[in-house]
Amino acid sequence: MAHKKAGGSSRNGRDSAGRRLGVKKYGGQEVIPGNIIVRQRGTKVNPGANVGMGKDHTLFALTEGRVVFAKKSGGKAFVSVEPIAKAAE
């Protein structure tokens, strides 16, 4: 009697969706309070002036202004928000 044993299932074939990490607002772009500037795992970029950090290390704007990226001594990257001087009305 012809017979073929059941084939084993493949152990591959899974992949997780991308996490959509990275810089969301680049240097020179204007932001309002609450805008996400960087989504990251760990502190690749540290918060500077007028920037807050969420529990998942997301950096966000605390004030209205323009995004500025900078490298400090030791190679640490920082992002801050410089308030835009409004013209006197």
Swiss-Prot record:
Residues 1-24 are annotated as: Disordered. The keyword Hydrolase does not apply. GO terms for biological process: translation. InterPro entries: Ribosomal_bL27 (IPR001684), Ribosomal_bL27_CS (IPR018261). Keywords: Ribonucleoprotein, Ribosomal protein. One of its GO terms (molecular function) is structural constituent of ribosome. Pfam families: Ribosomal_L27 (PF01016). Belongs to the bacterial ribosomal protein bL27 family. HAMAP family: Ribosomal_bL27 (MF_00539). This is Large ribosomal subunit protein bL27.
